[in-house]
Amino acid sequence: MILKLSKTKKMPCKSLSFPANKEVCKGMIDYVTKEMKDVCKGCYAKKGFYHMPNGKINRQDNYTLSKQDNFVETMIKEINNDLYFRWFDSGDIYSQEFLEKVLEVCKLTPTTNHWIPTKSRELFNQETWVLLEALPNVK
C-alpha cells in the first residue's frame, strides 16, 4: 500500500484524500440534532469522479496508512518541497491522534503553506488546534 496524494484541477497543489463517510468525516453530523449538517449534504466528494473504483481504493488506502506510525515521515517526504498543500479534498480530521500527526507534519514542513479545511474543529482537543493554527505556515 502506497500513499497517493491527489491533484485536483481547481487547486494549484497536491491534496490528501480520505473516504467521505461518517467514520472519517465525524464533523458532518450535528450532534445536537443528529442530522447531517447542511454544508455536508451537497458534498462534492460523494459524486462525480470520486465514485471511480481506483479513487475509492486510493482514499481508503490513504486512510489506513494515516493510522500507521510512519505516516508523519511519509507525508514529509511527499510534500516537503511543495509551496502549498491542501489537507482533504475529501475526508477530514477523524481523531485526536490524527490531529496530532497533522500538527507534526506542519511543524516539520515549515516552507510549505498548509490549508486545512475541516468540519471537525470542535470535536478534538482545543489546545492542539491552537498550537496548529498558531504555526505561520497553517491557514
Task: Locate each region found by the language model.
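Class I S-adenosyl-L-methionine
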Residues: 1-139
